[in-house]
C-alpha cells in the first residue's frame, strides 16, 4: 500500500504537503460546543451513531459528500467539519504515513517501535500480542488527540505468508491461518480496546481482503494480478484470518486489495464485500466500513480493465461495498456516475454513513469533557512499561536454529562484530516503521555487555564486492569470538518488491565461510522477515550457532545480546517454513494452490515436507520432557457438535525442564488423520499452542490446550467446513519422536459452516 512506487508518489506527496500546510495548529476535532455544527444532531451525544451521522449528511450538499469519499477528506469548512486524513499506519507502532505527522523534536517526535509482526509471530504468545496492541492503540489515540494522526489506523496485515518470496511477509505473523487468526483476534482486542464495541479507542483495519500476496514477481504486478483460487483454498487458507477479524474480533474497518480474485477486482466484488464479509460473517455493525487499498479503484479500470472508465469504476466499487477511496477516483468521477444512473444517492449515503458513524463512535464529534479517551496524551507515549514490552517482544521472538554448545556466550574477551547488520539502526525496524525514541544496535549492545569490540561490516546485504573482507577477517583474527550479523532487508524484500531467490543474497555466505575457516567460535545472527536457505550454515561445523531475529526494532541489539549471553533463554519458534533455495524453481509465485500438483510441490508445512528448517522449529538452552496426561481421549460424536468455535476438548500436557537453565517453552499441538474425510490429507495441522513462561530446572508444569471443533474439521472441495468421523492423533512440537495422543469421532459428517458459493463464470461489469 505505502511504497516508493512512482505511481503512488504524487498522491502521497500532495497529502503530505497539505498536512504540512495545516501545521497541526488547528484543533483536530469539530467544535461541537460553539461551532456551526453545535446545532446539528451529529453533536448530540444522546443519539445513536447512525442518526448522528445521517444528520451530518443531511446538512451537506452532493458535491460536499462526494469530496469526502477520499482518504484525505477536505471536510466542509462552512459547516465547521475539519479536514480528516483516514490514512494512518501503525503496523508495529505508530508509523510514518500520510495521516501521521511526527514532530521534529519534543512531544510526538517518536513512538514505541515494537518488533515486526513476523518476529512477534515467532513468540507464539497471544497475551503479549494483546499487550503490545493495547500500547499501540493508546499511543495511536494520543497522536490522534494531538492532531498528529487520525483516529483510525490501517493495520494489521493478515494475509497468510503463502510464498517465501513475498516482499511483505514480514508484515504478517507467519504462514499458518490458525496462528494468524489467533494473532489477529488478540491484536484487534488490544488495538480497539474500548469501553465497549460502541466506543473503540481507535479503529483498526484488517487488510488486504482477499488473496493478496504478490507485489511484483517477474512482471506480475499486484495492480493487475488475478489470483485464481479454489473454493477449498479460499475457505481453508485465505479467508480464516479475516473471518476471525470481522466475525469474532469485530474489527471496525477492512481494506480490499489491489488484485482480482477469480476475475473480479476485490474492491468491485459484491460477493466478497457483501455476501461473505457483511452477510455470512455478520459484519454489518454500526460504523463498519471498507476502504480500498491506495490506488485500487484506479486499478479496476486501468489495470484489470474490468470496466471502461473512472465513472464505472467508482460506481461498481461503491455499489459493491467499498466505502472509501484511498485515491482520487471517487471525488473525480462519482458525480458523473450518479448523473449517468450508475449509482444512487442512497448508496452514496450508505458509504458515508458508515464512515461518519465510525467517527461518532470514536468520540470525534463529542465534547472533550464527554469523551473518555480525549485525555490520552504525550505522557502515555513511549512509557517505561512500553519500552520494556518492546524489549520483551524482541527477546521472545528470537529463534535458536543451531547450537553446538557455544551458546550462551561467556561475557569476556574480545569479540569481532561483523556483517551488514552489525551497526544497523532503522534496518532493524523493517517496513511501516515510525520514528523510534532510540534504536539499540548490535555494536552498542556488545560494548554494553562489557566486550572489547572489533567492528568491521565486511560486506553489504546484496553486495558482490569483497573490498571489506580483509578488514573483517583481520578483526576476526584478533578476537576470541566472532559474531556475524546479516540476512536480508528492504534491499531485497519490501512492498512492491518480491524476491526471485531465497538464497542468502550477495556474497554474505562467502564471508561467513572464510570467517568459519579461522576456527574461531562463530555465531551467525540472521535478520529479515523472509527466510533464506541456511543449509550451508547448518552443515558447516565452523558455524557454531545460528539465530533468527527477524526485525526486532528499537530494542534489537539489547534483546539479541540477552539471548546470546544467556541472560534470557531462547524459546521462539519459526512461524514459517524455511524452504531450500531450489523451491522457487519448482512453483511459480502466481500459483495460488496450497496442495501439491503437477507443477507445485505443495505450500506451507501442511503440504510440503522437504523443509530445510520446518515451521515451528526452535531450540533451547535447556532440555524438556513433554508428555500427555492421557494418551486417549473421547470418544466424541458429531451429533453432540454445537458450533465451530465450541471447545471439543481441553487436552493437557506435562512439560518438565530436565536441563539446567530456566526457560520458556512453546507448546505447539498439531493434528493428523489418515481416515477422517477424503484424501489428500494434510501432513499435519496446527490446532493449538501456548507459551509457558519461566519453567525452572526440575520444574514440571501442566499446559491445557483448548482445541475447538472447527480446528478439527476439514474444508471440503466446495469450501464447506466439515467435521468428519474418524481417528485423529495429536502431536506436540515438531520432533517426530515426541509422544502422541489420540481420539476418535463417531457419527455422520456435519457441516459446521456452509461456504457461500461465488457466482460462476464472472464477466466484466
From Swiss-Prot:
SUPFAM superfamilies reported in the protein's UniProt record: (Trans)glycosidases, Beta-D-glucan exohydrolase, C-terminal domain
Catalytic reactions on record: Hydrolysis of (1->4)-beta-D-xylans, to remove successive D-xylose residues from the non-reducing termini
Any one Gene Ontology molecular-function term assigned to this protein's record: alpha-L-arabinofuranosidase activity
EC identifiers of the protein: 3.2.1.37
Primary localisation category: secreted
InterPro entries recorded: BXL, Fn3-like, Glyco_hydro_3_C, Glyco_hydro_3_C_sf, Glyco_hydro_3_N, Glyco_hydro_3_N_sf, Glycoside_hydrolase_SF, Ig-like_fold
Biological processes per GO annotation: arabinan catabolic process; xylan catabolic process
Active-site residue numbers: 293
Keywords from the UniProt entry: Carbohydrate metabolism, Glycoprotein, Glycosidase, Hydrolase, Polysaccharide degradation, Secreted, Signal, Xylan degradation
Coiled coil: none
Compartmental location: Secreted
Residues bearing carbohydrate: 67, 107, 345, 412, 423, 464, 761
GO cellular component: extracellular region
Listed PANTHER family: BETA-D-XYLOSIDASE 5-RELATED, SUGAR HYDROLASE-RELATED
Protein name according to UniProt: Probable exo-1,4-beta-xylosidase bxlB
Native source species: Aspergillus terreus (strain NIH 2624 / FGSC A1156)
Lineage: Eukaryota, Fungi, Dikarya, Ascomycota, Pezizomycotina
Amino acid at each position: 500500500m505505502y511504497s516508493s512506487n512512482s505511481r503512488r508518489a504524487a498522491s502521497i506527496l500532495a497529502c503530505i504537503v497539505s498536512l504540512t500546510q495545516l501545521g497541526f495548529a488547528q484543533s483536530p476535532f469539530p467544535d461541537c460546543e460553539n461551532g456551526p455544527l453545535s446545532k446539528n444532531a451529529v453533536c448530540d451525544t444522546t443519539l445513536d451513531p447512525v442518526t448522528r451521522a445521517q444528520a451530518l449528511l443531511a446538512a451537506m450538499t452532493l458535491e460536499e459528500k462526494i469530496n469526502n469519499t477520499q482518504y484525505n477528506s477536505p471536510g466542509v469548512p462552512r459547516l465547521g467539519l475539519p479536514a480528516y486524513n483516514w490514512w494512518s499506519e501503525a503496523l508495529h507502532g505508530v508509523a510514518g504515513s500520510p495521516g501521521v505527522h511526527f514532530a521534529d523534536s519534543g512531544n510526538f517526535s517518536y513512538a514505541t517501535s515494537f518488533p515486526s509482526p513476523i518476529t512477534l509471530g515467532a513468540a507464539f504468545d497471544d497475551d503479549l500480542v494483546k499487550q503490545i496492541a493495547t500500547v499501540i492503540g493508546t499511543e495511536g489515540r494520543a497522536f490522534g488527540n494531538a492532531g498528529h494522526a487520525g483516529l483510525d489506523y490501517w493495520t494489521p496485515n493478515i494475509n497468510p505468508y503463502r510464498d517465501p518470496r513475498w516482499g511483505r511477509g514480514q508484515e504478517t505473523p507467519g504462514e499458518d491461518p490458525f496462528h494468524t487468526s489467533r494473532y489477529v483476534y488478540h491484536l484487534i482486542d488490544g488495538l480497539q480496546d474500548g469501553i465497549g464495541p460502541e466506543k473503540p479507542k481507535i479503529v483498526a483495519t484488517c487488510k488486504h481482503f482477499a488473496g493478496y500476496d504478490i507485489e511484483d514477481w517477474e512482471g506480475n504486478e499486484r495492480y493487475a494480478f488475478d489470483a485464481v483460487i479454489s473454493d477449498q483454498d479460499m475457505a481453508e487458507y485465505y479467508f480464516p484470518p479475516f473471518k476471525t477479524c470481522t466475525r469474532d474480533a469485530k474489527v471496525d474497518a477492512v481494506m480490499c486489495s489491489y488484485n482480482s480474485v477469480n476475475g473480479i477486482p476485490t474492491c468491485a466484488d459484491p460477493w466478497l464485500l457483501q455476501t461473505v464479509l457483511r452477510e455470512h460473517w455478520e459484519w454489518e455493525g454500526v460504523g463498519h466500513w471498507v476502504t480500498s487499498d491506495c490506488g485500487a479503484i484506479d486499478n479496476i479500470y486501468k489495470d484489470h480493465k474490468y470496466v471502461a472508465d473512472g465513472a464505472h469504476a467508482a460506481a461498481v466499487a461503491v455499489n459493491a461495498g467499498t466505502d472509501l477511496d484511498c485515491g482520487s477516483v471517487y471525488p473525480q468521477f462519482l458525480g458523473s456516475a450518479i448523473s449517468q444512473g450508475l449509482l444512487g444517492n442512497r448508496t452514496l449515503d450508505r458509504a458515508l454513513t458508515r464512515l461518519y458513524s465510525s467517527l461518532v463512535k470514536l468520540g470525534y464529534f463529542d465534547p472533550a469533557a464527554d469523551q473518555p479517551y480525549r485525555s490520552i496524551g504525550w505522557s502515555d507515549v513511549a512509557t517505561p512499561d512500553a519500552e520494556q514490552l518492546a524489549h520483551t517482544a524482541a527477546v521472545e521472538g528470537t529463534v535458536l536454529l543451531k547450537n553446538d554448545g557455544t551458546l550462551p556466550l561467556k561475557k569476556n574477551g574480545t569479540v569481532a562484530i561483523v556483517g551488514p547488520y552489525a551497526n544497523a539502526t532503522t534496518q532493524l525496524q523493517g517496513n511501516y516503521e515510525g520514528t523510534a525514541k532510540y534504536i539499540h544496535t548490535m555494536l552498542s549492545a556488545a560494548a554494553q555487555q562489557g566486550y572489547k569490540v572489533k567492528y568491521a561490516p565486511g560486506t553489504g546485504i546484496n553486495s558482490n564486492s569483497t573490498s571489506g573482507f580483509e578488514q573483517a577477517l583481520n578483526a576476526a583474527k584478533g578476537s576470541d569470538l566472532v559474531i556475524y550479523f546479516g540476512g536480508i532487508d528492504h534491499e531485497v524484500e519490501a512492498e512492491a518488491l518480491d524476491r526471485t531467490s531465497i538464497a542468502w543474497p550477495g556474497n554474505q555466505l562467502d564471508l561467513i565461510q572464510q570467517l568459519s575457516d579461522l576456527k574461531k567460535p562463530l555465531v551467525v545472527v540472521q535478520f529479515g522477515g523472509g527466510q533464506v536457505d541456511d543449509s550451508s550454515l547448518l552443515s558447516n561445523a565452523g558455524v557454531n550457532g545460528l539465530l533468527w531475529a527477524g526485525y526486532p526494532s528499537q530494542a534489537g541489539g539489547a534483546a539479541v545480546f540477552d539471548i546470546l549471553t544467556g541472560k534470557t533463554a531462547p524459546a521462539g519458534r519459526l512461524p514459517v517454513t524455511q524452504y531450500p533455495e531450489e523451491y522457487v524453481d519448482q512453483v511459480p509465485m502466481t500459483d495460488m494452490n496450497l496442495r501439491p500438483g503437477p507443477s507445485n510441490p505443495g505450500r506451507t508445512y501442511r503440504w510440503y515436507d522437504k523443509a530445510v528448517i520446518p515451521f515451528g522449529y526452535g531450540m533451547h538452552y535447556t532440555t524438556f520432557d513433554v508428555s500427555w496426561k492421557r494418551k486417549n481421549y473421547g470418544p466424541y460424536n458429531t451429533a453432540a457438535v454445537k458450533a465451530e468455535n465450541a471447545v471439543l476438548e481441553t487436552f493437557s500436557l506435562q512439560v518438565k525442564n530436565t536441563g539446567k537453565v530456566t526457560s520458556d517453552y512453546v507448546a505447539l499441538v498439531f493434528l493428523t488423520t489418515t481416515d477422517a474425510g477424503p484424501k489428500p490429507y494434510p501432513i499435519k495441522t496446527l490446532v493449538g499452542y501456548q507459551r509457558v513462561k519461566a519453567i525452572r530446572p526440575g520444574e514440571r508444569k501442566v499446559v491445557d490446550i483448548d482445541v475447538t471443533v472447527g480446528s478439527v474439521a476439514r474444508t471440503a472441495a466446495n469450501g464447506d467446513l466439515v467435521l468428519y468421523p474418524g481417528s485423529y492423533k495429536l502431536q506436540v512440537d515438531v520432533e517426530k519422536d515426541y509422544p502422541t495422543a489420540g481420539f476418535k469421532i463417531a457419527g455422520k459428517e456435519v457441516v459446521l459452516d456452509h461456504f457461500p458459493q461465488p457466482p460462476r463464470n464472472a464477466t466484466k461489469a
